[in-house]
């Protein structure tokens, strides 16, 4: 509201820059000390004391008074060890009291280390307030007795079941046969056609062989293996479709429709695949503007991945 608003008035006693209280002679403390024989500018304490030679200008200045909220002594342990309201030099004073009381140097060193740890903890608490270290439990040691018991149980089971051993020995050759069949299936078609003589086979015969092999599989296989085989068969079909689309029309016929009359007369409704056509299908490359576009996209990706080039661009701009 500007000048029409309520004015904020502060008392002189609440002003931190006010030093009138130090010069006033009507205060309670000034009156008590003057009644005890103290005069302004004089030192505190007896004038003829043995330690009067240690008095300095600081002895005549104002002192700081801290009100205690407990009835503990000077060397007592505070309630909050992380509190920083301790007077300066109290740790040295505590060490001195400990030496006078007959404490050894080892105990004094331990107390000094404890104080340093407390100071570090207070610094960490002020710097990172919500930090808490929790053990993860990954380095837990296993009990050796428990492992021995498990090994003994396994040995007993093996000795008590000789029939299970025979069954496992019989199952091993079956598993090896299945692995050989799967390897034979996973071999690429072009390697077979190039290594051996160019054998011509129809797709129908290939489908029949795959069906025969699928019937020979033992029905006790797990569901996961069946799912994997289905996925593999789907991938093969997709690869065959992609190869048919990429191979030129003059080499492979599509569904019984062959481009040449001679090939149509030789094979009625059958599709023949040669090794050269498979090699050409695998070496499919874009032509024309697709080559330029793919190069441009590749250069753009490489430039974005390079951090140094990006920094240079930003620096120059």
Curated annotation (Swiss-Prot):
**What UniProt keywords apply to this chain's record, in alphabetical order?**
Nucleus, Ribosome biogenesis, rRNA processing
* Composition bias type Polar residues, residue spans: 192-219
Record keywords: Zinc included?
A: no
Question: Where does the record place Basic residues bias?
Answer: 171-182, 224-236
Segments carrying the region annotation (Disordered) are 152-268
UniProt KW Metal-binding keyword: no
GO annotation, biological process: rRNA processing
Localization (cell) = Nucleus, Nucleolus
- Listed Basic and acidic residues bias regions: 154-170
Q: Which family is this protein grouped under?
A: Belongs to the PINX1 family.
Q: What does this protein do?
A: Involved in rRNA-processing at A0, A1 and A2 sites and negatively regulates telomerase.
Protein name, as recorded: Protein PXR1
Q: What is the originating organism of this protein?
A: Coccidioides immitis (strain RS) (Valley fever fungus)
What lineage does UniProt assign to this protein's organism? Eukaryota, Fungi, Dikarya, Ascomycota, Pezizomycotina
Name of the encoding gene: PXR1
